[in-house]
């Protein structure tokens, strides 16, 4: 499968193309090029690490949106055993922009849910590019209530540009559905861990991120509006998205400094899309430790800790 390279990854792409060319030549019996190939691979790895160590906020935004980045279905496949998907909000219908259900995470029964964007044209249309409608958020509430009833921890995975802004969604109460989902997350008497795996866009993201612990992958973003949207409002020019991203404090280090997220999960060199299996395993190890740390808290303590976490936002990192 042909890889998708971002513009700033072009030098890396050129080196990898050269490696493929020499590998094909070597395998055809034309020459022994092992020494040259090893040198090229080392150069590529060094360049990849250097490139990703100095990404600016706009470049991180592009990485967060990378089409080959692992999505919810990949995390479920890699981390959740015996997954049983539950569909529908019992009011209107099912929204595949949010996928959720029951399963076992490293031996522990959990409820898992999150945004799914899709990997190709067909699945992106099926999942509406991860932009949920009201029935998606009401399905999330239904799953949260089930988790509370059976005393199961909740794992959520956030990756959305925002809730779907269509007329039908507004007619069916989009704002109310987002608010109810956020409210339910804040009052659950079980552990809740949210992970921003790509884009965390506006209320559509917060509805699944009212958690005891909010994690974020190293090159993910989390914001009230997209850089393009902010540029359109501030300067009436969406093409100034890079300028907006530089000002918005949407990257993981800035969010951690302000207390909006609690932990940054390191990505493989070259981003999560460069080695999805390593990314999934790394996140699984972090989630396991986070769940263990919360296993000693009572239901009342979980609710209080979660509320206090959000009360404290805005009290640090702003000086």
Regions found by a protein language model. Give the residues of each.
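Terminal peptide-recognition signature
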Residues: 15, 56, 112, 159, ...
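Short, motif-level signal for alpha-helix interfacial/capping segments enriched in acidic residues
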Residues: 33-36, 136-137, 230
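Short hinge/gating elements
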Residues: 51, 61-64, 125-129, 270-273
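Short coil/turn segments at secondary-structure boundaries
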Residues: 67, 71, 128-131, 169, ...
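Short active-site-adjacent helix-start/loop capping segments
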Residues: 70-72, 120-122, 164-166
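Conserved catalytic cores of soluble enzyme domains
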Residues: 158-288, 292, 296
